[in-house]
């Protein structure tokens, strides 16, 4: 980073501060992880200079024979990783991957179904604040108020009543197993498409420890970061050749222009890492760590939505403590723990305040932490939440979390 230090001291100083923050903070945001230096090197490479509109072998620019190699490697690795016949690695994000499916298969005004944002869904699944909710007629399904789990009977009833053209499964804040097969069966009853958004679960799916939607959903979308531990970006998978053609056209020229070849190369690196045996062991630990966090918090009398987790994340209902999600987020950050405020099912609080928090284990697992460290972290969270106005305790926890981070360092040898 000598060139940045020499030519742009403001950005250099920012990078130094952010690296320090990441090194010295317990990261529990479920959608974040710690990418390898190999991934970051590919993303920071000379490929950032190359325009390559189109697809390998069919570009609208010259000089693409080398970057074609990068994209082809990424495609083949993605197909192998998820056992899919077709893969599009060009989406700049998960949101753009999702919108490409809407663009490929639907017309404005068509009916779609997705999990309600307030019950753990995602903005792109039909939220009125998102283009998916502005352009389409949205019917939302929910989780059971009693169990906190998906109500498949409700889904089937709503599908038969409203006959949507697209059913979206997947979530941004749902910790349990998705029954992809059942949703696909329901979709078939009304000849609807089933799109699975496995953005949060992709790494677990790749490792074979969470059910794969690829054999059931017509289309599967995902991000390439989160549990997959790659660069920020999107990916689309399908086993249907006709749908693959429509998806490719929806991405380019329908939604995007030039693909980000440096990011695609970084995706290829991440997919290669995920194909290695140690990635499966990592994901097993991600799951074990999430379960340990949830169990320890529950032992400390915190309420876990749905009673636990089958994945890398879960929600904590803070109402019994009379603590708001935003207050918890802000105070825990002072204590050296970052996570995010999150609405819980049937939450009466505003989205800017919330009654819950979301906790995830991918980043701390990447550090090398295991169950004993999860107990320490969970006990620290309990201590802070039960003493939320006690500056002395917050300071003590911050010191403890810094020591824990130093025991499990990241990016050794990397200096800005």
UniProtKB/Swiss-Prot annotation:
Residue numbers carrying N6-(pyridoxal phosphate)lysine = 226
Q: Which InterPro entries match?
A: PyrdxlP-dep_Trfase, PyrdxlP-dep_Trfase_major, PyrdxlP-dep_Trfase_small, Ser_HO-MeTrfase, Ser_HO-MeTrfase-like, Ser_HO-MeTrfase_PLP_BS, SHMT-like_dom
Instruction: Give binding positions for (6S)-5,6,7,8-tetrahydrofolate.
Output: 117, 121-123, 242
Instruction: Give the cofactors, semicolon-separated.
Output: pyridoxal 5'-phosphate
Keyword Transferase included in the entry's annotation: yes
Q: Which GO terms describe its cellular component?
A: cytosol
Spell out the SUPFAM superfamilies in the cross-references: PLP-dependent transferases
Q: Which reaction does it catalyse?
A: (6R)-5,10-methylene-5,6,7,8-tetrahydrofolate + glycine + H2O = (6S)-5,6,7,8-tetrahydrofolate + L-serine
| Molecular-function GO terms, alphabetical | glycine hydroxymethyltransferase activity; pyridoxal phosphate binding
The residues that cross the membrane are none
Q: Reply yes or no: does the keyword Cytoplasm apply.
A: yes
List residue numbers at the site (Plays an important role in substrate specificity). 225
Query: Which keywords accompany this UniProt record?
Result: Amino-acid biosynthesis, Cytoplasm, One-carbon metabolism, Pyridoxal phosphate, Transferase
Q: Subcellular location, in the record's words?
A: Cytoplasm
Q: In which pathway does it act?
A: One-carbon metabolism; tetrahydrofolate interconversion; Amino-acid biosynthesis; glycine biosynthesis; glycine from L-serine: step 1/1
Function of this protein?
A: Catalyzes the reversible interconversion of serine and glycine with tetrahydrofolate (THF) serving as the one-carbon carrier. This reaction serves as the major source of one-carbon groups required for the biosynthesis of purines, thymidylate, methionine, and other important biomolecules. Also exhibits THF-independent aldolase activity toward beta-hydroxyamino acids, producing glycine and aldehydes, via a retro-aldol mechanism.
**Name this protein carries in UniProt:** Serine hydroxymethyltransferase
Provide the species name.
Answer: Endomicrobium trichonymphae
């Amino acid at each position: 980073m000598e060139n940045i230090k020499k030519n742009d001291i403001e950005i250099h100083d920012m990078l130094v501060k952010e690296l320090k923050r990441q090194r010295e903070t317990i990261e529990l945001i479920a959608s974040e992880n710690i990418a390898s230096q190999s991934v970051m090197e590919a993303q920071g490479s000379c490929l950032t200079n190359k325009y390559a509109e189109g697809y390998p072998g069919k570009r609208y620019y010259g000089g693409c024979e080398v970057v074609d190699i990068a994209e082809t490697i990424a495609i083949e690795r993605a197909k192998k990783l998820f056992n899919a016949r077709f893969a599009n690695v060009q989406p700049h994000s998960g949101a753009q991957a999702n919108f490409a499916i809407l663009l490929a298969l639907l017309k404005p005004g068509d009916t779609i179904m997705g999990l309600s944002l307030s019950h753990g869904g995602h903005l792109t699944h039909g939220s009125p604040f998102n283009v998916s909710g502005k352009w389409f007629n949205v019917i939302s399904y929910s989780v059971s108020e009693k169990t906190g789990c998906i109500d498949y009977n409700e889904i089937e009833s709503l599908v038969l009543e409203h006959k949507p053209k697209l059913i979206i499964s997947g979530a941004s804040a749902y910790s349990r197993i998705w029954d992809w097969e059942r949703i696909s069966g329901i979709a078939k009853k009304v000849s609807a498409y089933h799109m699975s958004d496995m953005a949060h679960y992709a790494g677990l799916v790749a490792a074979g420890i969470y059910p794969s939607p690829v054999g059931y959903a017509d289309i599967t979308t995902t991000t390439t970061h989160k549990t997959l531990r790659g660069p920020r970006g999107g990916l689309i998978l399908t086993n249907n050749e006709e749908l693959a053609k429509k998806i490719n056209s929806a991405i380019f020229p329908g939604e995007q222009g030039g693909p980000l070849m440096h990011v695609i190369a970084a995706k290829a690196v991440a997919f290669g890492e995920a194909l290695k045996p140690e990635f499966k062991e990592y994901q097993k630990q991600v799951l074990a760590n999430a379960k340990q966090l949830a169990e320890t918090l529950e032992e400390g009398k915190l309420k876990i939505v749905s009673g636990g987790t089958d994945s890398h994340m879960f929600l904590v209902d803070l109402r019994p403590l009379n603590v708001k999600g935003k207050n918890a987020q802000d105070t825990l950050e002072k204590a050296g723990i970052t996570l995010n405020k999150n609405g819980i099912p049937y939450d009466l609080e505003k989205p800017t305040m919330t009654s819950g928090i979301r906790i995830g284990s991918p980043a701390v697992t990447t550090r090398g932490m295991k169950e004993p460290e999860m107990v320490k972290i969970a006990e620290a969270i309990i201590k802070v939440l039960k003493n939320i106005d006690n500056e002395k305790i917050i300071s003590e926890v911050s010191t403890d979390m810094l020591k824990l981070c130093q025991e499990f360092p990241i990016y050794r040898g990397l200096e800005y």
